[in-house]
Amino acid sequence: MTHLWVRAEQRPNEARVGLTPDGAKTLRQAGFQVTVEESAQRAIDLEGYNAVGCSIAPENAWPDAPDDAVIFGLKELPEDGTPLGHRHIMFGHAFKGQYGGQTLLRRFQAGGGTLYDLEYLVDDTGRRLAAFGYWAGYAGAAVSLKCWAAQQN
């Protein structure tokens, strides 16, 4: 049985999560074990995950997850230099020369873990599956204008 462990995000104000309770329900029905970490900032409450049979773990417990667990998150891991075991699904930003990418890869090498970088998740035609949607650019422009306007006062 595949065990998916949804970790709490570490970045301040990061309320997103890559798996909804409905998605967790689908995985559970397919035979997956799903563990979701507590999170003080996640936009989705734990009750929905509980209701579909997910296990709940304390925030930041993923380093102690069973060895066979696949750790799933969106953004970067804590930059504490510890070796990384497990298989991790996340936006690693490690293969295009991004800042900290080589350090992250060395941590995986030291811990024997594996990074499945969502930036490289593609379909059979090579099209990215985990990409920004159509409206992301407009939302980014709106937030930029709002920040600029706030700086003018």
Mark where each language-model region is:
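Glycine/serine-rich phosphate-binding loop and adjoining beta1-alpha1 elements at the start
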Residues: 2-3, 79-153
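An N-terminal-biased, well-structured beta-alpha scaffold segment characteristic
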Residues: 2-107
